[in-house]
Each structure stands twice: as structure tokens, then as C-alpha cells.
Amino acid sequence: MQGAQTSEDNLGSQSQPGPCGYIYFYPLATYPLREVATLGTGYAGHRCLTVPLLCGITVEPGFSINVKALHRRPDPNCGLLRATSYHRDIYVFHNAHMVPPIFEGPGLEALCGETREVFGYDAYSALPRESSKPGDFFPEGLDPSAYLGAVAITEAFKERLYSGNLVAIPSLKQEVAVGQSASVRVPLYDKEVFPEGVPQLRQFYNSDLSRCMHEALYTGLAQALRVRRVGKLVELLEKQSLQDQAKVAKVAPLKEFPASTISHPDSGALMIVDSAACELAVSYAPAMLEASHETPASLNYDSWPLFADCEGPEARVAALHRYNASLAPHVSTQIFATNSVLYVSGVSKSTGQGKESLFNSFYMTHGLGTLQEGTWDPCRRPCFSGWGGPDVTGTNGPGNYAVEHLVYAASFSPNLLARYAYYLQFCQGQKSSLTPVPETGSYVAGAAASPMCSLCEGRAPAVCLNTLFFRLRDRFPPVMSTQRRDPYVISGASGSYNETDFLGNFLNFIDKEDDGQRPDDEPRYTYWQLNQNLLERLSRLGIDAEGKLEKEPHGPRDFVKMFKDVDAAVDAEVVQFMNSMAKNNITYKDLVKSCYHVMQYSCNPFAQPACPIFTQLFYRSLLTILQDISLPICMCYENDNPGLGQSPPEWLKGHYQTLCTNFRSLAIDKGVLTAKEAKVVHGEPTCDLPDLDAALQGRVYGRRLPVRMSKVLMLCPRNIKIKNRVVFTGENAALQNSFIKSTTRRENYIINGPYMKFLNTYHKTLFPDTKLSSLYLWHNFSRRRSVPVPSGASAEEYSDLALFVDGGSRAHEESNVIDVVPGNLVTYAKQRLNNAILKACGQTQFYISLIQGLVPRTQSVPARDYPHVLGTRAVESAAAYAEATSSLTATTVVCAATDCLSQVCKARPVVTLPVTINKYTGVNGNNQIFQAGNLGYFMGRGVDRNLLQAPGAGLRKQAGGSSMRKKFVFATPTLGLTVKRRTQAATTYEIENIRAGLEAIISQKQEEDCVFDVVCNLVDAMGEACASLTRDDAEYLLGRFSVLADSVLETLATIASSGIEWTAEAARDFLEGVWGGPGAAQDNFISVAEPVSTASQASAGLLLGGGGQGSGGRRKRRLATVLPGLEV
């Protein structure tokens, strides 16, 4: 881990002193309540809700998320500051009922309370005092009925807010502009700031707010730690924060263990390791969350590009709904996936011998069945009797998922449950072929409208949670109790550094710099540069980064030329790249075997999407990963210090301090979680602060107070790294069958080849008269060798097209090890590029592993199967339902698979992915434990239709399954939605594009006289300006090929004297009439034998396609000839 930084380097030292939080008051008359509702967690009858902290909607622009909070005064003349960041969400508690609910289904609060009880989690117990009255915290002159009240609280002091130990000081009010509303904020200080004490009536407490925190925040933490006494957990967290007890074991007495742990042959060690992992997560996770964080651009709500074209509040709310729809697949995946992080149920230990590494013998398990089993306390006494649930025993297999399991996933919080239900409304149902069910309309008008419904009693069947559950019932996962070691699915924001091109981090040189900066005369040609250069070449051909063409092909000649131009650009880049590797003596054949796709999961809470659900998922993901990476450390320490019959709390009393102290150096920066340790200082011995004692009495004075930091070291998390090996190197026979490439030639080589999607896209352009589909036409050609020719078209052109497609497809099938059918020209070019590199590296036997992105696409569909569009209106019959929904539409979301994830990763996506953390030791006697976060697989058939196993694509027959060599990641780009796209610092002049285009033409046509094409390109770009070109102009435009300037000027002069129109078509026709086309001059060549000495050959090295070498005696070698001959 990186050493402590100086005070000038970290955000904590740069933050300013301030309070522990603020109470914000927004005027109801001007505040955008519907936008807040779309961002929040309101439900029918809510008294408090959570909303993301965003500049411009909940806090003022320029709000600092990092602060040095004044939280204590040991004596009247000294203050203690603590560096912390704000909590990701704010809590709306005053007049919260004025915010519309995000989900209108009734009965959520009662359902959550009942389900919490049957799962054994304790409910919120209010303090034995009344909630603070508005007069205690409202500034003078404000009417409490005209304002909405919300609390923004810091991470380090949210437990103090929960327990009513903060003091609001209305006399220190500040007027701030939040969006279009003139709002007011009042600071909150800890009661320890007042040495003489504060009357309890002056301490701010709101039972509805604390209940919301108990349900929406702390119950989720308790679930991640597998403890059921939530209130006691909050007390321990407050004590740890207040008294700095991070190295003291706290939660072990609260732990509960299922029967599988109690009955395990090594149950004593398993209980100790489980408890120790939870203790480490409790010690380190709060420290990481309250550390200072970078302020991302997405925090500025008032500058979201999402609202760029919105006129009026209705359009803004509609834009927010569309944005929320794009996030729905991430939320639904966590509900529908069997291995969701929400269903992680405990720690298991393998009993097998030899197969599992010792460090992987302890692992995290998941299973809804385990979560509802009976449990025992650390002293092996029964403490929770369990819950049977509906068919949980699974008489005919796994148990059935029930509404109660959905409530469990939402942490028994009606606020979170409403938000989950809102996202699930965007999802499409998948009807099982085995269980025929009634139509949605029949259900809504029948069972849902019955008074027997426990939630809505038949009054609001269209929006009832039971109706939503019925519509999606076949997508929910089975209820099982598993002890397998499977990945778990995490969700959050992607980091800024991802390497997801086909070859991942191949030749990135990041970890190989031993002596700092390299000399300028030895530049590194990295794989990243290669991809950037390729994109630049394609842009010169009129192809943008997404594969879109500036000029579409209009016939077979244009179609063939389009691909030949792309092929030439790719081949030129590959030759240059391979030459560079050979020149620098890079052992690329070995390096390609160890390359990975790399993805980063950001640990910045404010980089997460603006949604309380993602705050919950981020907390759960971080706590689970911390426990996972701590398991081998706890196991080794328990092996060295066996429990010998001690209970986990007893064992931890004697060993936890040492274990906690060593965890930082043993687990951080060891392959998965990266963090930095920062030293926080305050530059001045004193600071200007209000006189809080006087302010409490209503008098506002300033004073200069001596201060010091109460906590100096801060652990700032950065990223969690997830990898995926590109080249298969394993020995497992089953896996090998999935990756091995068949040597038999396939009959359908064209429809599985690189051109098929383009042939389908331009089918009507190429064959305007045919009624045959493109699939049948080209499949038929591969068997019968015939293509139709439209009337009036050139048979030669279509013959050339067919031969080009046939030859290119055959060559592609022979060399291809990237199992995708490219859908755009960028993917086509990258596939050709990487196939050439892999062939040069000798990797032709196995397909490589791929990461495909599942990118959401919103769509508007008829509302027949989406009853929630009707709202709370009553439904009398199925016919009335059909009539009511016939004219309505519903917004739904589906995911489309992308062939290459790299372009999506550049757009700062929100990602949902499965991860497995493997542990291993170093090499050459290094006994340190390292971790590797490996990309895994989703479990559950209802996650997404793209993940369902298909028997084949088109007419393709494949022996090995492709699922093992294709990993999937849900990815929602945020660039252009919540983050502005970067504008180019410098604009490109037109003359630069002309020059680059001419150089590209000459570079690609070194074997033939290219003056003809250069002149036509010049005329097309400059028109009549060509007549006035000087020699200096021509030499500049031709760049390093300026020797052609005279020939180009002579040809332009010939065109000018002819008097023809200055267009590319007219110039081409004229020159073809004069010269007979490019290369038509019939010169008489003789063969000249040129002796070359062996010594000169050895010194010259490998020459690949040099420029300006004269006539055909030294033609540029073909790529297929060059690459196999490369030797390092």
C-alpha cells in the first residue's frame, strides 16, 4: 500500500472546517417535488424518504462533500476536527408526505414489518422521548407548513443523528440557492461540542428519520454481516466511531450461525473465521466510507446533459424516467440472479482434498434457503427458529421465491421496496413453457381485485406489489441452500481505467517500468496506441468510433472497396506494430499468454448512480468483498492460534487487535482492493468558527478557536480490480472443449463470417430486385456458387463481390480465434487486427475469452401486459382492462449484447458483474497472500434473455459450447446522460484532414502509381481551389511524399486547361480518357538481377513493405507471408 501522503496532497487536509451536517429547508411553492420523487424512495403513506445528495436539487452548487467536522471540545478553548465525507443520500423528514411516491402500491409498510418479524430481524425501537418539534430547529420567520425539511449528514456522524445526539442551531442559518429555490440550511453539531452540556429538548431527534435509517441503511449492513440485532449493531458502530475502537472486537457476540456451520466437522474454526471476517469488515468499511473522496462530475445535477433538450418540468421528469429505465437491468439482475450479493448467506469451508487451494478453502456462499433457516449463537444455543415460507422445502425441487424474499432483498425497508418495485416495472416478463398461466388482464380483474389481497384489498390491483410479482414470477430465482463456491454479483460505477479490447492489457508496459521514464529515442508502441491509431485511420476513411459511415456504399463496387480500404488500414497498422515489437526485442509470444481483460469497480460512493438502491448495493458489495479477502488471513491466524474449544468472542478478545493491525498490510493492494493511506493535518493552529455557546442562545458571534485533528490517518479506497484471462492456458478437459477451435471446415462459413451482418444491412442496396433473404442467398451461394444479378447491373461487379466475400470468409474461418460476427466496421477492423496479432504469436488453436457488454435499450410498447400504467384506478373486468390499456404505452427496457466492450467502457458505465476472488501465494518462496478478482458467471435463468443458452446461431453447428468463452457484463453508459462529453481542446482544420487523407492513399498504394487517385481526392476536397495551388501548397499537402508534387501539379494543370467541371467524377472520367485509368501506361520492363550479400541481409533485418521502392521488383510483401516469419 502506498505510504502516507503529505498534507498538500490529499483531499482531507484541503477540506474546510464545518459542522457534522445540515438541515435543509426547501420552499414547497418552487421546489421540484416530482423530480425529487423520481429520484427518491417514497411509497404510499411514507413519513420519511431518502434522496441522493446532488448539487442543484438537494444541496447548493459548489457544496463540498469533504469536511473537517468540529465534533468535540475537550475544554472551552480547544476544538477537535475530524476529516470525513458526507453520506451519499439525504433524508427528507419534514412534510415528506408532500413528495409523491415513486411506487403507488399500498401495504408496503405492513408487509415489511411482518416479514422482518418472520426473518427474525429486530424492528426499530424509538427513543423514550418525543421527536423534536419544528420550533426547535426551524429558523425564525419560516413557516414550517410551507417548507420541506431534509438532513444531509456526514458519514462519521450518521449514528449520532440516528441516536438523537446532534444539536441544530437555527440562529446560524444560511440562505442558499438550490436549483430555482431560495432555500435555507441550519448546521448540526455534536452535543460534545458544548462542554457545559445541552438540554435534551434542544437535541435534534426525529423518530421517522431514525426509523428510515434503521430500515434503509443499517438493516442492509446487518444482513451483510449476518447479524439480526440491528439496533445493537448501530450502538456498536456509534461507539466505534466516537471512541475510536476500530481494533476492538464488537459484533462477534451478535453473530448467528446456520445449521450447516454448527454441524461442520471443523465448526469451531469456521465460526471463528466467519466472526473475524465480520469484525474486520466492521473496522475497515466505515473508515473507507468516511474517507475523503473525489467529487465526480455527475454530482452536478444542474448540468446533467440528460436535461439539455427539456422544456418544462414534465419533460425533465420524463427524462429522469428514461434514465431510471436504463438502470433497471442492474437492479433486476440483483433480484433475479441466484448468486446476487443480496443473497450472500454465510461462510463455508470445503471438505474436499487436493482440488481446492488451501487459501480458497474458506469462501462466501449464497442461498435464500440458508437465510431463512434456524440459527445458533456463538455458544451454540438456538436463537432463531427459522421460517418455513411457501414450499421452502421444495418437495418437487427447489423452493418457490415469494414476495417475502423480495422484501428481504429490500432490507425490509418500505422505502427501498418501493424503489425496487419501481425498477421492476420496467422489466419484461418471461413466461415459462411448462406452466401455462392466465393473462395479465384476467389476473388484474380477478384475483388482484379480490378483497383477499393482503396488500391492496382489491382497491388498487393495477399497481399492487402482488400483481407485479405475478407478472414476473417466472424470472425470480429458486430458493436453495447451497454450499458451492460460486461468484457473487456486484453493482456500481466502473473505474476510469478499463482494458476491455480483445487482447485486454497486452503490452501496456504499466507494470514493467523499472527505471522511471524511458529515453525519448525509445518510444513504446503499446497495444492501446495501436487501437487508437487504428481508430484514427478509420476516421480518415469516414468511419467514426461507433462504426458509422459518412458515406454509405451504393453498389457492389463500393461495398468491396469499403472493406478493402479497411483491410489495408488494418494491415498497415499490424505491420508497423509487429515491426516495433521485433525492433524492441519484446517477447510478445510469451506476453500474450498472460494478458487479461481488466475492469475496475469504483470505491467512491459519490461515483455511484444517483439512487438509494445503488447506495445499498455499494455498501453490500464493499462489505462482502472485504470479508472475502480477509478469509485466508483469518484462517492462517486461526491455524497458528487454534481456538481449542473457545467461542468466537473469547478467541477474538485475545487475538483481534493483532489481526486488525496486520490486515491493512496483508489485504490492501494485493491484487483486488487498492487504497491509499493519507495523513490529514490542519494547516493553521486556529480557525474562524462561530461562537457556538452564544449561537445556542440566539446570539451570533465569531471567534478564533484553537483546533487540532482527532484522527490523523485516513484510508482512502480507490478501486476493486476484476480480471478475465484472454488466452486459454488451462488443462481442464471440459473447459478445453469450450475453447478449442475445430479444424473441420464448416459449410456455413459465409453466414458465420465477417461480412454477413453487412451483407444483410445492405441487402436491398446490393440486390434491389431479389425476394430472397440475405441469409438464404449467401447460404445458397456457399453450396451452389451462384448469386442473382439485378437487371441492368454489371455481372462482373457481382462476380467480384461474390469472390471477395467467398475468399475473405474462407481466410477468416481459417485464422479466426475471436468468436464474434462483427456488427460494425470498427469491430470488423479490430477482429482482423487481433487475429493477425494472435497468429503472429502462435495462438491459433484455441478461441480467446471475450467480455460482451449487455447495454440497456429503452422502448415503448403497448401496455397490455403492464398494468401499472393504469395507476390506482379500479378494474371491473378483463374486457374493461383491455379497453383501458388499449390506448396506453409502457416504457420497458431490454439489453443488447455488444461484441466489444471497450467502446462502452469509455463512456464511464454503471456495471453489474459476477466476481470470484481467488487467493494464492507468491512465487520463489514469497509466502505473502495475494488475491485475484476474476470475472465469473450469472446464475439463474431469469436474469436476462441474452444469458439463456441457445443451441446455435443461424445455421451454425458447433461442438463446444460458447458460453464458457464468453463472459457478460451489464453496462449502462453515463457519458451524455449524467456526465458531459469532453469537447476537443483544439479543432481540426480541414487542410489537416486533406493532408492525412492524401498520405493514407499514397501509403496504401505503394505498389502502383497513385497520382491518379491523389488528384481525384484533391479535386473532391478542394474543387476550383486546385487551379491556384502553388508548389509550396502541394508539397505541404503531400507531406513526406512531397516528391510527387510536380506530377500532381502537372495533372491539375491538364485538368484546368481542359475546362471541365471541378468535380471528382468529371476529373476521374477525363483522366481515364487521357490515361486509360490508373496504372494503364504499358511500359516495357526488363528483369535486373541485383546481387545482395549475406552480410547486408543480416544487418538490414526484416523489411516489411517499405515506401517508395520503385517498380515491381521489390513489391510489398503480403501480411500473410510476413507475420509467420517474424522471429524475436
Swiss-Prot record:
Pfam family of the protein (one): Viral_DNA_bp
Query: Gene Ontology cellular component?
Result: host cell nucleus; viral tegument
A GO molecular function annotation here is: single-stranded DNA binding
GO annotation terms (biological process): bidirectional double-stranded viral DNA replication; DNA replication
Spell out the InterPro entries in the cross-references. DBP_sf (IPR035989), Viral_ssDBP_head (IPR043031), Viral_ssDNA-bd (IPR000635)
Q: Does the UniProt entry include the keyword DNA-binding?
A: yes
- Locations listed in the record: Virion tegument; Host nucleus
What keywords tag this UniProt record? DNA replication, DNA-binding, Host nucleus, Virion, Virion tegument
Q: Where is this region: Required for nuclear localization?
A: 1104-1128
List, alphabetically, the HAMAP family matched.
Answer: HSV_DNBI (MF_04007)
Instruction: Share what the entry says about its subunit structure, partners included.
Output: Homooligomers. Forms double-helical filaments necessary for the formation of replication compartments within the host nucleus. Interacts with the origin-binding protein. Interacts with the helicase primase complex; this interaction stimulates primer synthesis activity of the helicase-primase complex. Interacts with the DNA polymerase. Interacts with the alkaline exonuclease; this interaction increases its nuclease processivity.
Its biological purpose is as follows:
Plays several crucial roles in viral infection. Participates in the opening of the viral DNA origin to initiate replication by interacting with the origin-binding protein. May disrupt loops, hairpins and other secondary structures present on ssDNA to reduce and eliminate pausing of viral DNA polymerase at specific sites during elongation. Promotes viral DNA recombination by performing strand-transfer, characterized by the ability to transfer a DNA strand from a linear duplex to a complementary single-stranded DNA circle. Can also catalyze the renaturation of complementary single strands.
Q: Which family does the entry's similarity section mention?
A: Belongs to the herpesviridae major DNA-binding protein family.
Q: What is this protein called?
A: Major DNA-binding protein
Q: Which gene encodes it?
A: DBP
